[in-house]
Amino acid sequence: MLTYETWEENVVSFSEEDETKGALSVLNWAYKEYKDEVVYACSFGVEGMVLLHIINQVNPSAKVVFLDTNVHFQETYELIQKVRERFPSLNIIEKQPELTLDEQAKLHGEKLWESNPNLCCKIRKILPLEKSLVVEKAWISGLRREQSETRKHTKFINQDHRFQSIKVCPLIHWTWKEVWRYVYKHSLPYNPLHDVGYPSIGCEKCTLPVGDGGDSRDGRWAGKVKTECGLHYQ
C-alpha cells in the first residue's frame, strides 16, 4: 500500500483517455488500494457534484466528510440534503469543530473570520479534518490545476505533508467548462449560488460573488492576502 511513509513518485500511472479525464481510473485505484481507509473531503461545490457522481459508480457506500463550520450558506446545507436523496448509500458525515461559535467568540473575540481568518479556518476546518484523517490512509479532493497558481502543479496522487497522508486529486485536468458540461449531462444537483456569481463557495462570512472576468477564487476572503483555507498547503 502506498502511504505517506512509503511514498514514491510516479509508482502508478492512469489513462486519461475517457470522459472523466482519468478521474474514474484514479478513483478505482484509490478504493482498491485503500478500501475503507480513504475519505472524500467534500465542500459541495460544483466539482464535488462531479466527484460524488463518479465515486458513487466506483464505491456506492464511500465515506464523504463535510467540514461543517456552522457558518456555511443555507443553500449549501440544502444541497447536502439533495445529494443524500440522489446518492442515498453514500456515507456523508458532517464533521463539527470542537468549539461552537459562542465558545470561539468567548476565547478569541467576535467575528474571528474578520480579525484572524487563518485561526478561524484552523479551528473550524483544519483541525476537524485532521481528526477525520487520523483513521484514514488517504483522502480525496476536488482540486483542479486550472483553479489557481497554488494548485497548478497538483498531481493525481500527492504526498500531503500538511496532514501526513496521501491526497488523491482525480479532477486535476478538468476545466471549468468541462465540470459544468458533466453536471448538465448527468442532471446533477448543484448550489444555486453558482448561478449568481459564486464560482467558489465557502463559508458565508468569507465568500463574495465574483465579477465578470474575475478569477474563480477572487470571492474567497476578498480584501485579504489569504486565498486558501489551509487544507491544501504542501
UniProtKB/Swiss-Prot annotation:
Q: What is its EC number?
A: 1.8.4.10
Q: Where in the cell is it found?
A: Cytoplasm
Recite the UniProt cofactor note for this protein.
Answer: Binds 1 [4Fe-4S] cluster per subunit.
Q: What does the record list as GO biological process?
A: cysteine biosynthetic process; hydrogen sulfide biosynthetic process; sulfate assimilation, phosphoadenylyl sulfate reduction by phosphoadenylyl-sulfate reductase (thioredoxin)
> So where's the catalytic machinery, residue-wise?
C229
Q: InterPro entries in the record, alphabetically?
A: APS_reductase, PAPS/APS_Rdtase, PAPS_reduct_dom, Rossmann-like_a/b/a_fold
Keyword Iron included in the entry's annotation: yes
Record NCBIfam families: APS_reductase (TIGR02055), cysH (TIGR00434), PRK02090.1 (NF002537)
What family does the Swiss-Prot or TrEMBL record give for this protein? Belongs to the PAPS reductase family. CysH subfamily.
Name of this protein: Adenosine 5'-phosphosulfate reductase
Source organism of this protein record: Bacillus cereus (strain B4264)
